[in-house]
Amino acid sequence: MAIGPKPESIIGSCDHPPQAEAQTGARLAAINGNNSPVSRLKDFTTDPWLTSTDQPQPGSTTNVPYSPPDSTKHARILIVGAGYGGLLFAVRLLQSGFTLEDILLVDSAGGFGGTWYWNRYPGLMCDIESYIYMPLLEETKNIPSQKYVSGEELRTHAERIAEKWKLGARTLFRTTVSDLTWDDNKLQWIATASCSSNERKQAGCTYTINADFAILANGTLSKPKVPDLPGIDDYTGRIFHTARWDYDYTGGSPAIPAMDQLRTKKVGVIGTGSTAVQVIPQLARWAGELTVFQRTPGAVGLQINRETDHAWWRDNVQLAGPEWQRKRCENFNAFITNPYRASLDAEDLVKDGWTKHPSFSVALGGARNLQADFLDLAKKIDKERREIGQQHINSTVRDPATAEALFNPTYGWCKRPCFHQGYFETYNRENVRLVSTPGQGITKLTRNGIMWGHQEFELDLIVLATGYELGSLCPANRARLSIHGRGRVSMSQKWASGPATLHGVMTRGFPNLFFPGTSQAGVTANQSYMFDRAAEHIAYIIQNARPRTAASAVNPKVRIEPSLEAEELWAMETVSRAKAFAATKTCSAGSYTISARLGESVDESQMARHMPWGEGMASYVKILEEWRKKRDMHGLEVVYD
């Protein structure tokens, strides 16, 4: 099938008037949310990767519910999450002097990896260079196979980290923490946890974990997000989300995604974001027919992948010496947060689409964001970027109407950019067509497929490539759990009037609780680097709060929290730099920026408190390092029992 016998009749031709992007938020609902079409999506909450039925122990990945042994019911430090973030927190704590027995990780997944555990769709890979994204490469002596490795390799690396530091014995999988409550008498957190199984006939179990310290290491890319799809119960075909891929239906496996069972199938994909950009070319290779439903075009740049040459690795990457990975990460950060390229006295080590996209610093913050000419310069270089992108699409996609629909004309800081090698070429295939629904989305699902306007598209399979539920900026809501601090005050209550933190990792009234930003903390495109700097800082705080006297052998309880003055001062320092993100207000309500996520109901002063550190990641890291060098724990109240 061609892109369409009359592409112009499909692309932007619906009788419905285009709707504003602001309507998008109301139509998006998280799985398990009140507006989810539960009857068809209930399978999305199960774990498709569990296979064994043996009785599990801590660290196992089986699917039978269990009661944890007594040793797991108390922990010095509870880490919620066992993806790259949780692993980094655990490793940095061990390196700071804590023992394995001090640490307990819990995760709702059946294994290590976080988003790389859940996501195993065809074409999955990192779009940040693997040499800087995969954590602890220096310590594990691992050499990634490619510049951008597959999801399978990313998950294997998580398991490698866990094995090296023996974290499997101190991890509870298939365990969900739903509530954290502070006990001010015992100076500890009481975590309500439940273990579960995919076997619905078996009941899960509920228990408590008492922890002296708690760290929220939940990532943002683990909970699938789906549109509120009218008519979903009428559809009789197969439907699943990319984060719960069904290889039994498509054929293939995560390691070898040869989807030979789709050769006679009509497949539809909803979405054209980062996930869709990776999965669409793979589906196009195998599906009999592929129809892509696009609400707004993705901002897709070119990604050139290559095998890692070991001689090059030795002579170029490791040549930087000790801490080479951190240096490479910080070189990357410098190039993506500085449109003033001539001022950078350094070589671009990563040399990819990210480092050629410095206007994205509008969304990340940077040392130059507060300069008077910054926005004009950002707009100028972003215009050049868009023109180059449009030329690439026009020269690649043969059908002019399709090429026009695939071009994203918005500023480069309003959407997270996507990168791929071969995405646009996919639309030249005879079995692929694009259905552009400008700013509106599909009309409804029918018994046989998808309706857009007055046209029905018959489909055997619908793949939801609709991303992940980011949640609110409140750490409790982002982690999808209830947190009550001193006086039973909920974190959501405190966040309602705008956050106050120390360094973006602690907040008063919630002692011994830590979280990795993003409000009032530094941010960058490389989330692993963000987690690592937070882990380094938090490990220092917990370790140095322990008493150093001989009497400390009895391990007295300790309460750590910011002083009221210190967290308010840090909040005001953040507010004073919030103008660095002023240009994000040019983005529509459907964008992923903080301004768009908070919405118009939040006033300017509150919004400024929610912003990241406006001077960028390098400035933020330097402030944390200088704070630690003073060794006085300034701004923290430390009380021993």
Curated annotation (Swiss-Prot):
Keyword Oxidoreductase: yes
Record-level GO BP terms: paraherquonin biosynthetic process
Pfam families xrefs: Pyr_redox_2
Binding site for FAD: 115-118, 127-128, 133
EC nos: 1.14.13.-
Matches recorded under SUPFAM superfamilies: FAD/NAD(P)-binding domain
Catalytic reaction list: protoaustinoid B + AH2 + O2 = preaustinoid A + A + H2O
Known pathway: Secondary metabolite biosynthesis; terpenoid biosynthesis
Site residues by UniProt (Transition state stabilizer): 416
Cofactor remark: Binds 1 FAD per subunit.
Region (Disordered): 1-69
Superkingdom of this protein's organism: Eukaryota
Gene Ontology molecular function: monooxygenase activity
Cofactor dependency: FAD
Start-end of Polar residues biased regions: 48-65
InterPro entries with a match to the protein in the record: FAD-binding_Monooxygenases, FAD/NAD-bd_sf, FAD/NAD-binding_dom
Family listed: Belongs to the FAD-binding monooxygenase family.
Function according to Swiss-Prot or TrEMBL: FAD-binding monooxygenase; part of the gene cluster that mediates the biosynthesis of paraherquonin, a meroterpenoid with a unique, highly congested hexacyclic molecular architecture. The first step of the pathway is the synthesis of 3,5-dimethylorsellinic acid (DMOA) by the polyketide synthase prhL.
Protein name listed in UniProt: FAD-binding monooxygenase prhJ
Organism: Penicillium brasilianum
Gene: prhJ
